[in-house]
Design a protein with these regions (language model features):
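Conserved redox-active cysteine motifs that mediate thiol-disulfide chemistry
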Residues: 1-12
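Sec/Tat-exported extracytoplasmic proteins
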Residues: 2, 17-20, 70, 88
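Conserved helix-turn-beta segment immediately C-terminal to the redox Cys motif
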Residues: 10-29
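Short, conserved sequence motifs used for protein processing/export or organelle targeting and
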Residues: 28-216
Length: 216
């Protein structure tokens, strides 16, 4: 909230989403010194333990910053467009991910299906998490405080991280189906939430990603 350049970063991401549509999945991780809640922002705390872990893992020390596919970065906002273009041009289409989400008494049930399009000869894991949009709060915009800023794609609590998907890899045509339950934080507005799922290789790099909006 106290990152004066983050609204500009958001504008860049919005433009990239307009360009790439569903091919580009954005998740906003609030961490670091600018994210610490204070009275000035009504103590709104959008940090998560997983977000803090990601910040440490990728050595984030300035904001806004981005990591693409857990592989490229961290990058300042001036490099995002070029690097995303390069990523789409050079990344092999190895698999498709299909998702379903249903709110149940036990929590949010997410169904995941992975269809391999080529042979992948290494162990694969899957990570799933919830993002929430239209969270209202205070945001510093180049020194001007916006009182009713709308935060988008915010990483929320209780992710499911690096779960085994295929310990020996997949062959072209293989299909893997799994179900996962999320414990839901009562503060979530499910009408504004989405589930993000990505498959990673043994180096932790993202091979494919998808997201689905949650219907309450």
């Amino acid at each position: 909230w106290n990152c004066p350049n983050c609204p500009d970063g958001t504008s860049i991401l919005n433009n990239l989403k307009e360009t790439y549509g569903e091919r580009l999945v954005v998740s906003a991780v609030h961490q670091g010194s600018f994210a610490k809640p204070k009275a000035e922002n009504n103590n709104l705390d959008l940090r998560t333990p997983y977000g803090d872990d990601l910040g440490s893992k990728f050595g984030l020390s300035s904001w806004p910053n981005a990591v693409i596919n857990r592989k490229i970065g961290p990058l300042g906002r001036g490099d995002w467009e070029t690097k995303i273009q390069e990523c789409f041009a050079n990344t092999e289409h190895l698999m498709n991910i299909s998702l379903g989400a249903e709110n149940t008494q036990q929590g949010l049930l997410v169904s995941l299906q992975v269809d391999a399009l080529k042979d992948i000869n290494e162990a694969l894991t899957v990570t799933l998490f919830i993002t929430e949009s239209d969270i209202k709060g205070v945001q510093n915009n180049q020194g001007v405080m916006i009182e009713d800023y709308s935060f988008q794609h915010v990483l929320r609590n209780n992710p499911i991280v690096d779960m085994p998907l295929a310990t020996t890899g997949l062959k072209d045509g293989d299909r893997v189906s799994k179900n996962y339950y999320f414990t839901l934080d009562k503060s979530l507005n499910l009408n504004n939430c989405a589930v993000v799922a990505f498959v990673s290789n043994s180096a932790g790099e993202v091979l494919q990603v998808n997201e689905i909006e949650v219907e309450n």
